[in-house]
């Protein structure tokens, strides 16, 4: 029987994992990558080509290595918990080499058009038109996986800033920022307080004369480093914390999170406190911003009302003169011009079942992979989406009816609108654990905690109270990995490894406290398990 051929569009993180997902299910992937190398967003270039995602030289990832790794390929234990972009790219190269993925990628190949074949209603096949070195080619594929991400088109709303066309200084989108030396001794306005805006404000403040960080709403600032020095995402991303948040509800959960954030620094005193609650916006992850604010190197300002030739006038009436540069850290938009009408994007919104499948196709042979902005790591979600998609392509899993999918999409969009502030940043928002657990159930790889509580209680405790790492979804079912159990039980060893660069005397009181805590957690765990039995 001839293998099904799958077109994978994009050779970034989602594309690499999708190639591997195809191979695991005996499919034949052909990946098209418009640039000359893998890595997508995480491959730094001084002058990236148009339409390609871009990062600045100093970027450090906001999710820790245990939460962002591929599910059957842990990141080396000596790597730092929060990796520089060069380490991230190096890990992707190791992954591609380990599983032999590069031979399936056609580099310097642009996908121009993807359209249904005339017999699509019965075959589900697609015609894919590509261009390589000036030559056009048409291929037929049994399914298509779109892995182009959502950081390609810079969102630059200049129409919202009257007078910017008269401004005599330099202005550009954060996509084009590379290093701080160009701003030495200058007065710089940064518009937007997302992750890029916060990072740029901190970095440029080390060379600039003054940085003004302009924010329309304000933001809650989340530390990478949490209690006792462990990564914050490791501490927050457990089934227990997710279970607890559902019991407490949004109001109490918000109150707790805001209290924790304000214990680090008072957001109101620093001029950062927004009107919305902490869990109503994607958080800004930044360890250094409050230090630069309290040192006076970064001044927080409100929204810019207008620009003059040399000044920025803010909505509160204040004015800053002699501005040399304005950087718009205003995010990105996405589209799929090569898909024609198969997937429509309206105001940065797209209708996809579980953020993967278009509901209006006669055959479920098109999947959008990685089009999500999670409260957590995106890499493991992309991988799990790919594992689900290839099962659907093979007919091993089926999707609900079109009406059922549309009803679920409408419900999901209403929930996003209810929870989050209205922003194009939140149109593809998703919760890490909820998304992973839901798709894992579709794939057949969601851990059975009730069964494990009796057969392997040590592991069950780790699965419930420990960080919900991607490796959890290799314990059972399709794609089971024999090393999963050991990798889960040694999670904290890998977290501590890069920090153990000097011997210190261990505290007995700490060991005792940990032992007591583990015992109490075990009691709580079995009480919950028995309640659900």
UniProtKB/Swiss-Prot annotation:
Cofactor: FAD
Transmembrane regions listed in the UniProt entry: 510-530
Residues reported in the UniProt entry to bind NADP(+): 196-199
Dimethylated arginine: residues bearing it: 5
EC annotation from Swiss-Prot or TrEMBL: 1.14.13.8, 1.6.3.1
Tissue expression: Expressed in liver.
Domain of life: Eukaryota
Coiled coil: none
Record's function text: Acts as a Baeyer-Villiger monooxygenase on a broad range of substrates. Catalyzes the insertion of an oxygen atom into a carbon-carbon bond adjacent to a carbonyl, which converts ketones to esters. Active on diverse carbonyl compounds, whereas soft nucleophiles are mostly non- or poorly reactive. In contrast with other forms of FMO it is non- or poorly active on 'classical' substrates such as drugs, pesticides, and dietary components containing soft nucleophilic heteroatoms. Able to oxidize drug molecules bearing a carbonyl group on an aliphatic chain, such as nabumetone and pentoxifylline.
Protein name per the record: Flavin-containing monooxygenase 5
Organism (species): Cavia porcellus (Guinea pig)
